From Swiss-Prot:
One record GO biological process: DNA-templated transcription
Record text about domains: The N-terminal domain is essential for RNAP assembly and basal transcription, whereas the C-terminal domain is involved in interaction with transcriptional regulators and with upstream promoter elements.
Region described as Alpha C-terminal domain (alpha-CTD): spans on this chain: 251-340
Organism: Rickettsia prowazekii (strain Madrid E)
Lineage of producing organism: Bacteria, Pseudomonadati, Pseudomonadota, Alphaproteobacteria, Rickettsiales
Coiled-coil regions listed in the entry: none
Function statement: DNA-dependent RNA polymerase catalyzes the transcription of DNA into RNA using the four ribonucleoside triphosphates as substrates.
EC number(s) recorded for this UniProt protein: 2.7.7.6
Any one GO molecular function term: protein dimerization activity
Pfam families: RNA_pol_A_bac (PF01000), RNA_pol_A_CTD (PF03118), RNA_pol_L (PF01193)
Stretch list, region Alpha N-terminal domain (alpha-NTD): 1-236
Reaction(s) catalysed (UniProt annotation): RNA(n) + a ribonucleoside 5'-triphosphate = RNA(n+1) + diphosphate
Annotated family: Belongs to the RNA polymerase alpha chain family.
Keywords for this protein: DNA-directed RNA polymerase, Nucleotidyltransferase, Transcription, Transferase
Protein name, as recorded: DNA-directed RNA polymerase subunit alpha
Length: 340
């Protein structure tokens, strides 16, 4: 009987996750995951997007209370907008809560002024993430007072499905968007592993409201998926002999280690990647003069790599028989324990 683990151990696994923040804000990030088996980019991208946009917890304003106003079809003296417009604007306020219990925050303004979210007195437990967001326009010598209830939740909750079944008279429930992720898009491109060029590279663009950073949001979404899928693993894995027989190889198993697993400087790593050097075996077959002819590769990078190779009793210019092996990816996985 074939080993069950061959169903997943023979698949290529992503070994690089890169997070690139946009210079103007920390709330937007580009996440690159590679390499993936063909088709897995679309599978993972779609699943991650759906979880990011639906299942993360966040905070939102769930109800408001304005003196002498009992429902959303009223008007507020001195306020240019009617109550329904004010509610629509309040729905756009992005909040962050440092506690899990509900909190009531208060707004008090005197006209003439443009009332913004930054005027709200939030106390220590609530933070306004978009303080310049406009709530309404207040006329001269007119005062506006308001209490706003903030809660923690997930997804989008309609006012008709509010957590509060019995709101006090005068308190108006509003639709609440708890999700801290504002947008998620993704695309899939080809990436190269060895001589194979049709593996998947998943590129995701994630924007949050600042309640969580994009990289944290992606991590939480991945954990949610992991927890949901765990139940499907309804079998016991067979204990396999992990003793690696290195004498079956015509070369050192260290040559099967990927160069991107080495602790190289960014410059050295990029030079090797651009020259299509994937494994240490690819690297040691090169001579020092070969390496120095590589674009942007200098003596400093050469010495750095020589020191690392020496730790494995390896050097440049080695004669490696039968390199590269046809099943190099499978061998690399099989002998992983011997060089880690």
């Amino acid at each position: 009987m074939l080993s069950l683990s061959k169903n997943w151990n023979t698949l290529i696994k992503p070994n690089r996750v890169t997070y690139e923040n946009f210079p103007e804000t920390n709330n937007k990030a580009k996440i690159i995951v590679e390499p993936l088996e063909r088709g897995f980019g679309l599978t993972l991208g779609n699943a991650m997007r759906r979880v990011l946009l639906s299942s993360l917890q966040g905070a939102a304003i769930t109800s408001i209370k304005i003196p002498a106003i009992e429902h959303e079809f009223s008007s507020i003296p001195g306020v240019q907008e009617d109550v329904s417009e004010v509610i629509l604007n309040i729905k756009g306020i992005e909040v962050k809560m440092h506690v899990s219990e509900k909190r009531i925050i208060k707004l008090k303004a005197m006209g003439p002024c443009v009332v913004t979210a930054g005027m709200i007195d939030t106390g220590h437990d609530v933070e306004i993430l978009n303080p310049d967001h406009v709530i309404c326009n207040l006329a001269k010598n007119k005062q506006l007072e308001m209490e706003l209830t903030c809660k923690v939740g997930k997804g989008y909750v309609l006012s008709t499905n509010s957590y509060e079944d019995n709101l006090p008279i005068g308190e108006i429930a509003i639709d609440a968007l708890f999700n801290p992720v504002k947008s998620v898009t993704y695309k899939v491109e080809n990436t190269r592993v060895g001589q194979v060029t049709d593996y998947d590279k998943l590129i995701m663009f994630v924007e949050t409201n600042g309640d969580v950073l994009p990289e944290m949001a992606v991590g939480l979404a991945a954990r949610i998926l992991q927890e949901q899928l765990q139940l499907f693993i309804a079998f016991e894995e067979q204990e396999e002999d992990k003793q690696v027989k290195t004498d079956s190889l015509p070369f050192s198993p260290y040559l099967l280690k990927r160069v991107d697993e080495l602790e190289l400087s960014v410059r050295s790593a990029n030079c090797l990647k651009n020259d299509n050097i994937i494994y240490i075996g690819d690297l040691v077959k090169r001579t020092e003069s070969d390496m120095l002819r590589t674009p942007n590769f200098g003596r400093k990078s050469l010495n750095e790599i020589k020191e690392i190779l020496a730790k494995f009793n390896l050097r440049f210019g080695m004669d490696v028989p039968d390199w590269p092996p046809e099943n190099i990816q499978e061998l690399s996985k099989r002998y992983e324990d011997s060089y880690n």
